[in-house]
């Protein structure tokens, strides 16, 4: 069983150009099984990477330090390098699970950078997939219930109220991609957002654009891994919070029957396939559209009618609105529907509104986006500091003095144009005023327009796509790779 299990879990591509590998091991059954499975598999490789086991001590329970020490002893017995990293500082009182997840990945990434590792593996299992699906599905059903109540309120009383309520509810659920009769999530080719979420945890992702994150156990049940450990006569640590019903995941776990578990596992697989196909369809659509991004402004020329009616078109519009506005999250399906309803590409007059941090201007020639002027703040980037400004620019100050970052001023823009003899056709100052400006006591720069070496400060600037910068799912890679060149702005001083 051990050999067969290990042979089915890993791909040849998992270890390509990998000299050092970080394994996240807490001491629980899932991660401990991962450790021994990887150890066994690497024996089959001619040039295996070096294993470095990392245990994250979240310091949320008194037992956590002792548990980390137990993992260290296991690694020492098997001659494997081991590191303990700790989540320091004050812990949040709410959303502790999600906050711990972010902290955990940040700590793993930092250790990977420190060790020169290009790959992190974690022990997420099929149980994690199924539980995640069920939690997200239940939230969708709650949203559907809210819609039903809103629809009834809109219809009012009367003999036809129930019929009207059902029709309105079904119509709104149809727009959201949620089944309107308490059934499954509607399987629609254009249900972009909800199938996206129900695809759950991807096998592979890219952490901070540099380190691969692979979860090879996603297709394996937890009990299978525990059987594997028993056969190897290995014991694992039981986390008491796994039985604490104050946590949503525990309640969901305890409610899942074997038959339902199998059914949900199949749905996760189908949703993942659909999400990857949708990503490819969106990538093809973006390539078919006439899109330009320059000087803080994105413009989508009015597409042919069949492209406007493409099921992915609302997603593309929402995507560029978020990216130009510096948002960290893609728009949910309900907001995409609202956004598309606001657009009329048949109007001869220019119309304008703000959405997702962007100004969106449209008429029969197309759609323009730029960062709205509201809530753009100035900041000081100290020497040696890396700072994310406005959700759009990552700035690293390599100089020996602080710099100020903020939006370009109108006076500075006009002066720059005059002194550098710029000839920008159809200059659009509202979008230019959203560009990053860097200044100190020696002067200022607007790096996307000009860079003044005379300022004698050294900086690195990178235009980021915030929803994908921290963690990019392989399921989204198809369209992200197509969008990336539009925002491939790098300045090195």
Curated annotation (Swiss-Prot):
InterPro entries: Rossmann-like_a/b/a_fold (IPR014729), TilS/TtcA_N (IPR011063), tRNA_Ile_lys_synt (IPR012094), tRNA_Ile_lys_synt_N (IPR012795). GO terms for molecular function: ATP binding; tRNA(Ile)-lysidine synthase activity. It catalyses: cytidine(34) in tRNA(Ile2) + L-lysine + ATP = lysidine(34) in tRNA(Ile2) + AMP + diphosphate + H(+). It is an enzyme of class 6 (ligase). Pfam families: ATP_bind_3 (PF01171). One of its GO terms (biological process) is tRNA modification. It comes from the Bacteria. ATP binds at residues 26-31. It is found in: Cytoplasm. GO terms for cellular component: cytoplasm. Its main location: cytoplasm. Its EC number is 6.3.4.19. The keyword ATP-binding applies. Keywords: ATP-binding, Cytoplasm, Ligase, Nucleotide-binding, tRNA processing. Belongs to the tRNA(Ile)-lysidine synthase family. NCBIfam families: lysidine_TilS_N. Ligates lysine onto the cytidine present at position 34 of the AUA codon-specific tRNA(Ile) that contains the anticodon CAU, in an ATP-dependent manner. Cytidine is converted to lysidine, thus changing the amino acid specificity of the tRNA from methionine to isoleucine. HAMAP family: tRNA_Ile_lys_synt. PANTHER family: TRNA(ILE)-LYSIDINE SYNTHASE-RELATED (PTHR43033:SF1). The N-terminal region contains the highly conserved SGGXDS motif, predicted to be a P-loop motif involved in ATP binding. This is tRNA(Ile)-lysidine synthase. It comes from Bartonella henselae (strain ATCC 49882 / DSM 28221 / CCUG 30454 / Houston 1). The gene is tilS.
């Amino acid at each position: 069983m051990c050999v067969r299990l290990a042979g089915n879990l890993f791909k040849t591509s998992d270890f390509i150009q990998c000299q050092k590998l970080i394994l996240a091991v807490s001491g629980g059954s899932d991660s401990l099984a991962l450790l021994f499975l990887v150890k066994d598999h690497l024996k089959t490789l001619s040039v295996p990477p070096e294993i470095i086991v990392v245990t994250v001590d979240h310091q949320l329970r008194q037992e956590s330090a002792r548990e980390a020490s137990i993992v260290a002893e296991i690694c020492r017995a098997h001659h494997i390098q081991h590191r303990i990293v700790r989540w320091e500082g004050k812990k949040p009182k709410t959303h502790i699970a999600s906050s711990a997840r972010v902290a955990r990945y940040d700590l793993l990434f930092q250790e990977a950078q420190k060790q020169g590792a290009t790959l992190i593996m974690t022990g997420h299992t099929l149980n994690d997939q199924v539980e995640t699906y069920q939690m997200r599905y239940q939230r969708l059903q709650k949203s559907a219930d809210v819609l039903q109540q809103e629809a009834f309120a809109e219809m009012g009383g009367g003999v036809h109220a129930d019929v009207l309520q059902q029709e309105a509810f079904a119509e709104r659920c149809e727009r959201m991609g949620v089944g309107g009769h308490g059934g499954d999530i509607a399987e629609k080719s254009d249900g972009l957002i909800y199938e996206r979420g129900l695809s759950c945890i991807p096998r592979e992702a890219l952490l901070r654009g540099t380190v691969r994150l692979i979860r090879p156990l996603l297709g394996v049940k937890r009990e299978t891994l525990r059987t594997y450990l028993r056969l190897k006569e290995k014991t694992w640590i039981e986390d008491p919070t796994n039985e604490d019903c104050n946590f949503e995941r525990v309640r969901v776990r305890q409610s899942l029957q074997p038959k339902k578990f199998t059914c949900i596992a199949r749905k996760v697989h189908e949703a993942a396939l659909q999400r990857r196909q949708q990503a490819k369809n969106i990538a093809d659509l973006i390539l078919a559209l006439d899109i330009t991004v320059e000087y803080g402004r994105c413009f989508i020329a009015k597409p042919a009618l069949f492209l406007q009616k493409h099921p992915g078109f609302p997603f593309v519009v929402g995507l560029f609105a978020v990216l130009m506005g510096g948002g960290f999250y893609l728009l949910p399906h309900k907001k995409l529907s609202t956004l598309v309803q606001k657009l009329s590409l048949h109007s001869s007059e220019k119309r304008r509104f703000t959405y997702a941090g962007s100004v969106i201007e449209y008429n029969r020639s197309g759609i323009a986006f730029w960062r709205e002027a509201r809530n753009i703040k100035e900041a000081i980037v100290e020497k040696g500091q890396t700072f994310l400004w406005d959700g759009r620019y990552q700035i690293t100050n390599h100089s020996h003095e602080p710099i100020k970052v903020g939006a370009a001023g109108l006076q500075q823009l006009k002066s720059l144009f005059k002194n550098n003899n710029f000839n920008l056709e159809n200059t659009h100052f509202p979008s230019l005023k959203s560009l990053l400006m860097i200044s100190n006591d020696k002067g200022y720069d607007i790096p996307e327009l000009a860079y003044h070496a005379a300022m004698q400060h050294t900086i690195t600037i990178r235009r980021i796509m915030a929803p994908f910068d921290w963690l990019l799912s392989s399921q989204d890679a198809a369209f992200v790779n197509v969008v990336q060149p539009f925002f491939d702005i790098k300045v090195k001083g």
